[in-house]
């Protein structure tokens, strides 16, 4: 059965049955996948508008309409109920066409990995790529200020510093310096550590005043109990938080105000949106968004931006007042929805009063400045692509570029990376890691040529099963003639010899082409060379980080892993009980046997492993293996 737009009779029949009540509509493709979820106070008018001939849809929505095979309706009593239901459905199904804002990686987020036993806090440019329990704050417009703030928080609060421990049996120097609570050796319980993370989350939510009051109470309690060392740490933390607040610009005289202000600037191709967060009279956050220009009314754009932003916000992060540059078409519905989420009344309006109007004007000026920056960046990216196509005599502009790099230490833990740039910008959803499988490549016997050949073979061997658009317009090999020759031999063997391929040597930034002995020289400062350097450096970073991760896993492998009968669960029990392998090694048989879940037989195996003669160890291991 064809899609609705190609089946006029079925489309007419479906549209005639539409009700005029409020509700939610779900657009589905031929496979039944939800493409888009929307709300409407009049479902008949809203859904019909998608299929009216000559309707000026944005390119994104026009593509979506062409894929609609059918739609589903859910009726509600009120428009506010429709907004709440739409929010829940979007969170559940994550339809691809409900994303208005561009995922351009321009602005960073701060992520807290609540899904982990000991949560991490880090800066990322990919929102929502992890576990649903993880929390994201942002996107922030000033990456430098964000990194500085995170650095200060790490000084004030002892936090997890690494993904993998440095040592198996003792904490690293960060613990000795008071920067980490020693969670790698479980010197702090998950409950205690998560309480610290909750305090940091309060800061990110703009609840610093509330946190300071809590810390003051804790300091007084510690001092009364004569725990002066703990009281001093709390005092230093309070001082640091006050210093952090001193750098925040006071924007309004009302010290209790909690409000967001949003404005936009647009040209023919792009919309730049800025949202300022004011809490307790201080500007605590400048968030930036961008979207492709669609010709929509500015009020409609702001409405959709706010809905998308607050959909991902916790109740504590919703302000009591939202100031908008333009009136919103459904401000009352949005205010009702936000009030239900927050549990308090939320006001939304385009201000006329001097102080509030000046705040919105300041946000609008920042949106205009950011739009100009984005335009300059876009022009430079396009110039780099055009210059590169000319310098390399490519058949077309390299919209999709792939770069490959190898990383190892003398053949140990050899890995490779693939990074992808689309229109001159990183497209991290296409990044890949590779573990080199060639058995000939081992410690002391590295072979970058064979490693590169393997990676290119694995990538293009599966190219036939991928959409045609996933083939690169240009392949960049991080290396000289040897690596390039190895890659080209494989590509030609797999019938992909027509894909343009170059090698980029690090030392002199020389560009090598297949079949040419002399390199192509691209002038320093040329946007084309800058583009090649960026993708090469990104591939190197991605490969090195993966190699470091693999090496860390190998180095931190516990000696307990060599004892039969001890899996992850029992290893955790033993380390929870004895804190480290050296302490367990010194324990008596009786102490080990008392450990819950271990038992006397396994305790004998463990004790013999650490203390017995080789023959005794072998007999104990054989007995345990036979018992299992």
Curated annotation (Swiss-Prot):
InterPro entries assigned to the protein according to its UniProt record, in alphabetical order: DisA/LigA_HHH, GIY-YIG_endonuc, GIY-YIG_endonuc_sf, GIY-YIG_UvrC_Cho, RuvA_2-like, UVR_dom, UVR_dom_sf, UvrABC_protein_C
GO molecular function: DNA binding; excinuclease ABC activity
SUPFAM superfamilies xrefs: C-terminal UvrC-binding domain of UvrB (SSF46600), GIY-YIG endonuclease (SSF82771), RuvA domain 2-like (SSF47781)
Domain of life the protein comes from: Bacteria
GO cellular component: cytoplasm; excinuclease repair complex
Residue ranges of domain UVR in the record: 209-244
SMART domains: GIYc
Swiss-Prot/TrEMBL keywords: Cytoplasm, DNA damage, DNA excision, DNA repair, Excision nuclease, SOS response
GO BP: any one term: SOS response
Limits of the GIY-YIG domain: 20-99
Function: The UvrABC repair system catalyzes the recognition and processing of DNA lesions. UvrC both incises the 5' and 3' sides of the lesion. The N-terminal half is responsible for the 3' incision and the C-terminal half is responsible for the 5' incision.
NCBIfam families documented for this protein: PRK00558.1-5, uvrC
Quaternary structure and partners: Interacts with UvrB in an incision complex.
UniProt similarity note: Belongs to the UvrC family.
Protein known as: UvrABC system protein C
Organism of this sequence: Gloeobacter violaceus (strain ATCC 29082 / PCC 7421)
Name of encoding gene: uvrC
